[in-house]
A protein has these predicted regions:
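Short, Lys/Arg-enriched anionic-surface-contact patches
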Residues: 17-37
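Recognition helices and adjacent regulatory flanks at domain boundaries
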Residues: 15-16, 83
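Short alpha-helical "recognition helix" segments of helix-turn-helix
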Residues: 53-58
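Short, amphipathic alpha-helical "recognition" segments used to contact nucleic acids or chromatin
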Residues: 35-49
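Helix-turn-helix DNA-binding helix
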Residues: 65-66
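Short, solvent-exposed alpha-helical "recognition" segments
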Residues: 69-83
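General nucleic-acid-binding
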Residues: 1-13
């Protein structure tokens, strides 16, 4: 749990333009791509795109889409972020 606390502390101190630098320093391009794709899938699900459509659009399996849905449904922060579109 110390690592999670450190992560949240560091994130809280960052200015907007520093996020990309931090994540580029810590994550491989593959990890960045995976996170970006999961975020896009969560957004599509938030916009009521069907599981099957998300699978086709994102090239993800049903288990991955299902996991993303259940981990993100009802998330206040995602509602706030995705509700702006």
């Amino acid at each position: 749990m110390q690592s999670k606390k450190l992560f949240l502390e560091v994130i809280g101190k960052l200015k907007d333009e520093e996020f990309e630098d931090l994540f580029s320093s810590l994550l491989s391009s593959s990890e960045m791509k995976d996170i970006s794709r999961r975020l896009m899938a969560a957004k599509l699900l938030h916009k009521s795109t069907t599981y099957e459509e998300v699978q086709d659009i994102m090239g993800m399996g049903s288990n991955t889409v299902n996991k993303i849905y259940f981990k993100t449904k009802g998330s206040p922060i995602l509602r706030k972020l995705f509700g702006r579109d």
